[in-house]
Amino acid sequence: MPLQVSDYSWQQTKTVVFLSLPLKGVCVRDTDVFCTENYLKVNFPPFLFEAFLYAPIDDESSKAKIGNDTIVFTLYKKEAAMWETLSVTGVDKEMMQRIREKSILQAQERAKEATEAKAAAKREDQKYALSVMMKIEEEERKKIEDMKENERIKATKELEAWKEYQRKAEEQKEIQREEKLCQKEKQIKEERKKLKYKSLTRNLASRNLAPKGRNSENIFTEKLKEDSIPAPRSVGSIKINFTPRVFPTALRESQVAEEEEWLHKQAEARRAMNTDIAELCDLKEEEKNPEWLKDKGNKLFATENYLAAINAYNLAIRLNNKMPLLYLNRAACHLKLKNLHKAIEDSSKALELLMPPVTDNANARMKAHVRRGTAFCQLELYVEGLQDYEAALKIDPSNKIVQIDAEKIRNVIQGTELKS
C-alpha cells in the first residue's frame, strides 16, 4: 500500500499554478509522472501523490522540473481564474476511479494520435524522398538521352560531311574526265584535219594532167567528203571460258559438298537485298550498297566512333540480313560499348550464318566464338565463355593469344570452385 504524500506546497496566479512536491530521498530514476487536464499523479515508491485538479489545465504546455530532491510543476490553466483549492473536494472513490480511467483513456488516445501523426510524417518524408529520387533518376535518364542524341547528331554530321566530301570528289573526277574527253576530241579533230590535208595533197598530185573545168573543185570536194567517212566495222565474237574456283584443301580432307553449299549461300546473300525501306529514297546509290556501308562502319570503328559504326551496320543489315560479317563487326562495337547481351546475340547470329563450317569461313567463326566468349566472361559466365574459347582453339589451335586467354579463364573457374 503506497503512502499518500500530503506535505506539498502550491501557489497560483490567474493563469499558472506552481506545485512543489518533495521526493523524500527517492531516486529520480524511480519517479513516474502522469498528467492530464484534470488529473496529476506522481508515483515514487513507496510514496504516491494524486491530485484531482480543481479546473482543467493545458497538459501539453505544462512543465515539471526535478532538482534538489524536489519536483516543481508549472501548470498552465485553460481558463484564467483563481482556484479555491488544488484538488476537488468531496469526491468519492467511484468518482476518483472514473477520473483515473478517463485520464488513462485520454492519454492513450493522445499517444495513439501522436503515433499516427508520426507515422504520417514518416510516410510523407518517404514520399518526398521517393519523389526526389525519381526526379534525380529522371534527370540522369534525360542526361543520358541527351548524350545519346548529341552522339547521334555528331555521327550524322560526320556522315553528311563525309558524303559531301565524296560528292565533291566525284564531281572533281567527273570534271577531270570531261576535260580529258575534250582534249581527246580536240586531238581527234586535229588528226582528221591532218588526214584531210594529206588526202587533198595526194589527189592534187594525181590529177595534175586532168583537164580543169568549171565544176572540178565541187567534184573534188564531194569526193573528199565521201573518202572521209569511215567504213562500218566488221562484226566479230569472243568466246570466254571461266576458270572454276578451286579450294586449297587436300583431296583426302576435302569437303566439296560443304564448300559448294557455302559458295551458294554467299551468292544468295549478295543477291538478298531489301529495298522496301523508307530511308532509301534520301540516299545515294552507293549508300544503298551493304558492302559500302560495311566499309564505312569499319572506318568509323577504327576511329573509335562506335555508335556511328553501329548505325552504319544497322542500315546494312536492314538492306541485307544474310551477311555474317555485318553481325560479327557489330558485335565488336557492342563489346566496346559494354552492350554485352547484344554482343552475344550478334555473335550467335554470325555463327548461324557461317554455316556450314569450311576453311573459307574459319577465321570469321573463330572471331565470333572469341567475341561471344569475351561477352560471357564480362558477364561473369566463365564456363560459357571457356566453351567458346575452346571452340575457337579447335578452329585455330596455334593462336597464342586465344590460348593464353583460355588458360586465364580456366584459372578463374578453378579459383571460384575452390572458394565455394
UniProtKB/Swiss-Prot annotation:
InterPro entries: CS_dom, CS_DYX1C1, Dynein_assembly_factor_4, HSP20-like_chaperone, TPR-like_helical_dom_sf, TPR_rpt. TPR repeats lie at residues 290-323, 324-357, 366-399. It comes from the Eukaryota. GO terms for biological process: determination of left/right symmetry; epithelial cilium movement involved in extracellular fluid movement; establishment of localization in cell; heart development; inner dynein arm assembly; learning or memory; neuron migration; outer dynein arm assembly. Keywords: Cell projection, Cytoplasm, Neurogenesis, Nucleus, Repeat, TPR repeat. Involved in neuronal migration during development of the cerebral neocortex. May regulate the stability and proteasomal degradation of the estrogen receptors that play an important role in neuronal differentiation, survival and plasticity. Axonemal dynein assembly factor required for ciliary motility. Residues 7-103 are annotated as: Mediates interaction with ESR1 and STUB1. One of its GO terms (cellular component) is plasma membrane. Interacts with ZMYND10. Interacts with STUB1. Interacts with ESR1 and ESR2. Interacts with DNAAF2. Interacts with CCT3, CCT4, CCT5 and CCT8. Interacts with DNAAF6/PIH1D3. GO terms for molecular function: nuclear estrogen receptor binding. Residues 3-87 form the CS domain. This is Dynein axonemal assembly factor 4. SMART domains: TPR. It holds the Pfam family CS.
